[in-house]
Regions:
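A short beta-strand motif characteristic of beta-propeller blades
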Residues: 33-39, 85-91, 131-137, 174-182, ...
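A short helix->beta-strand "capping" segment at the edge of beta-propeller domains
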Residues: 25-45
Length: 347
């Protein structure tokens, strides 16, 4: 009888150990992807958006300006990184493009250029038949240009104006305002992040010492949370909005992870600042102040260093951008000695 009981306990403990082990996130892997670009010393490329198997890059050149738009976009590169094919979409203007999304076979992008000490922006739909301007306006500076994102497979954009913030939906050639947040401004460049079904943005609300994060879905604002410190960057995962906290010149950093479902918030110290945060699935990627990459799991508060480039250790800490691939992984763009390299990261 004692032997049976002992075996039963061993079996139960084994199940518990397996259960705990199964909760450990899988080891992330980084697979290099051949670059679709061959750029001259005067050219530069910026990834704008990414989906499963495809991405969009803006390729342009420095225009010699000392302020305002410093680049002109020459063309967009539609890139299928799964099979390596790509095609160019000429821009044929003096504008600069920093925000874009896919809309099935179409492209939507926001371009801008200097106009009488202000910034003139346009929302463009690009199809096989040509380009159509859907909306336009002016902003006081380039960091007030609208930011595009996708919600429930529908193109959207966040607009900052003197009267407050607006979220607009793009349906074919029609643009409609679906949310207004009055009496607040953007504390930095117009930035929004989406996991496909919810989205988040930061706003400076009257009377708040620091930024307030708004978490929304197609029905409107789900919740808003005033943050306790200045924000480095922020991101959204399937379940959380993660905000890196701390002033750039501070010695102490932390984060707040806000559960989208009920608003419960976890606050903890971070050994490094969280810069260039991006979320996908159940994880976040970011770089620290030395551009060393890290992966963070908000549901367990586990943080690990991330090895991307295994060929040359000295090339680990180079300027890197992360983009969700829409399937729980990421596409990384790394600038090594003014040459762009790409990796797909499975997390």
């Amino acid at each position: 009888m004692k032997r049976i009981l002992l075996l039963s306990l061993v079996f139960v403990f084994s199940l518990c150990a397996c259960s705990k082990q199964s909760q450990q996130p899988p080891e992330p892997t980084a697979q290099p992807i051949p670059s679709p670009l061959t750029l001259s010393a005067e050219e530069d490329a910026l990834m704008l958006c990414c989906e499963e198997n495809r991405a969009l890059l803006a390729v342009g050149h420095r225009n010699g300006a000392q302020e305002g738009p410093l680049h002109n976009t020459d063309y967009l590169l539609r890139w299928n990184y799964a099979d390596g094919t790509s095609d160019k979409v000429p821009i044929q203007s003096q504008a600069y493009i920093t925000s874009a999304v896919f809309d099935k076979a179409d492209l939507l992008y926001v371009d801008y250029e200097a106009a009488d000490a202000r910034i003139a922006w346009s929302l463009i739909r690009c199809t096989e038949a040509g380009k159509t301007t859907l909306a336009s306006g002016q902003a006081d500076s380039y960091d007030r240009v609208p930011a595009l994102f996708t919600l429930d497979k529908q193109p959207m954009y966040l607009l900052a104006e003197d009267s407050g913030l607006s979220v607009c939906r793009v349906d074919g050639s029609k643009v409609s305002t679906v949310l207004t947040v009055p009496d607040c401004t953007m504390p930095g460049p117009v930035t929004v992040c989406s996991n496909g079904t919810q989205y988040a943005f930061l706003a400076a609300v009257n009377g708040a010492a620091y930024g307030t994060v708004f978490i929304c879905d197609g029905s409107g604002i789900l919740r808003q949370k005033e943050l306790s410190k200045p924000v480095t960057t922020f991101a959204i995962t399937d379940d959380y909005v993660v905000c890196g906290l701390g002033a750039p010149d501070a010695d102490a950093f932390s984060y707040e992870a806000i559960l989208i479902g009920n608003g419960n918030t976890t606050t903890a110290d971070s050994a490094t600042p969280m810069w260039r945060l991006a979320g996908s699935g159940h994880s976040c990627l970011y770089v620290d102040g030395a551009f060393a990459p890290h992966i963070f799991y908000p549901n367990t508060q586990q943080t690990d260093t991330l090895t991307i480039n295994t060929d040359t250790a000295a090339y680990q800490n180079w300027p890197t951008l992360f983009f969700s691939d829409g399937a729980g992984g990421y596409l990384a763009q790394m600038d090594i000695d003014n040459t762009d390299y790409f990796w797909h990261i499975a997390a």
